[in-house]
Every structure is written in structure tokens, then in C-alpha cells.
A protein has these predicted regions:
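Mobile genetic element proteins and their domesticated derivatives, centered on retroelements
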Residues: 21, 38, 44, 64, ...
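Mobile-element integrase/transposase regions
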Residues: 1-39, 45, 62-66, 70-73, ...
């Protein structure tokens, strides 16, 4: 399936649509390394990632294996497995990946060539991650991997996203969003009520002293 100018099948719940893509890093003395990521479209939560030495179909399927294991979707029978959204890179159009997706009951949507906006969420993830991770120099793949671990944890659990009501991806992914937003609204109402009371109290005191 190919996506049009604008992705017409937005997700309505977690684990309905997963975006996946590669981005690359160069480690002096080691060469190029490639980060394979699976991002939940609804929550922006990074479900799985791998630092790879190639961009092969097996790297993609290994990352998807990690994602299915993390969500335990490989252990339960569900009506619909996550739909995969990718670009048209060689690894994503390969027969090997098509066979893997069929075996795992997953459908696949590919963006229109030269139209990265279709995968805007994972592209923004790449930018946010590289803005932080590339501030340092890495001399070993393990150093880069350690920094990626830290940033993924921060991104999932501590970084607020304006596009999801200033919640973290983990808040949305684990279903805490509604409760957090309700709590914020209660705090806001109580704060406004307290400010009004303080204002009226000051005004009354001023009038009594006049």
C-alpha cells in the first residue's frame, strides 16, 4: 500500500500503526552505524531500536521482533497486529521483509517516494535525537549505544510533546494521559479559585481600612 500526499489513515490507539526508519552515525575508526527505530504513531513512544552495521531487511525484522516482544504482541492473539509505515528503501520493499510481515500478520504502508512528510513523526524523532546525541564524539559503538539508551529513556518518559497535549510519549502509550490532564485541570481550577479568593480578601481588607 502506498500513502498519498497526506497520510489518510491516522492512528486512533496505541500499537495500531508503527513508523519505522533508519538514520546513520559515523564513528571514527569504525565506520558507519545505522539506527533502526520503531515508533508508535499514536503516542510517539519509541517501542524498539537497534544500532546496526547494515540497513538490511533482517535488521528491520530484528527490530520488529524486539517491538513485538516488548509489547508482548508475539505472545497473545489479537485481531489486528500493528500496521507498519516506512519509506521505499531497499530493505522495506524487499521480499524478505514482506514474508516476515505476512508471517507475523502485519500489513505495510509505504510513503510516496521523495515525500518524507508521510513519516513526519519519526523524522522529528531523528532530529530531536541527533540534536542531543551528536553533541558528543564517540570512539566506540558501545559509547554511542549507551548515549542512545539514555536519550530514548528521556524522550519516552521525560520529554513533553506539545502535539500530544504536553504529555510524554509514555503517558499516552501507557494510558495515563486522561488522568494527568484531568489532574492538571483540577489544579488549574483550584489555583484560579484561590487567586480569586486572595484578591477578594485583599480588596475587602483594603475597603475596611479606607
Amino acid at each position: 500500500m502506498e500513502a498519498g500526499d497526506k497520510f489518510q489513515q491516522p492512528s486512533r490507539r496505541v500499537n495500531e500503526l508503527w513508523q519505522t526508519d533508519f538514520t546513520y552515525f559515523k564513528i571514527i575508526g569504525w565506520g558507519w552505524y545505522y539506527l533502526s527505530t520503531v515508533l508508535d504513531d499514536y503516542s510517539r513512544f519509541i517501542v524498539a531500536w537497534r544500532l546496526c552495521t547494515t540497513m538490511s531487511a533482517s535488521d528491520v525484522s530484528d527490530t520488529l521482533d524486539d517491538a513485538l516482544a516488548f509489547t508482548e504482541l508475539n505472545q497473545v492473539k489479537v485481531r489486528h497486529r500493528p500496521r507498519l509505515l516506512s519509506d521505499n528503501g531497499p530493505c522495506y520493499i524487499s521480499g524478505e521483509l514482506a514474508d516476515y510481515l505476512e508471517e507475523n500478520g502485519m500489513s505495510h504502508t509505504r510513503g510516496r517516494p521523495y515525500h518524507p512528510q508521510t513519516q513526519g513523526k519519526i523524522e522529528r524523532w531523528h532530529r530531536s535525537m541527533k540534536n542531543q546525541v551528536l553533541l558528543n564524539h564517540y570512539y566506540l559503538p558501545s559509547e554511542l549505544e549507551e548515549q542512545l539508551h539514555r536519550f530514548v529513556s528521556y524522550y519516552n518518559h521525560d520529554r513533553y510533546h506539545e502535539s500530544i497535549d504536553n504529555l510524554t510519549p509514555a503517558d499516552v502509550y501507557y494510558g495515563r494521559g486522561e488522568a494527568i490532564l484531568s489532574q492538571r485541570e483540577r489544579i488549574k481550577r483550584n489555583t484560579i479559585a484561590l487567586r480569586r479568593k486572595n484578591h477578594y480578601d485583599r480588596q475587602r481588607t483594603h475597603n475596611l481600612m479606607s
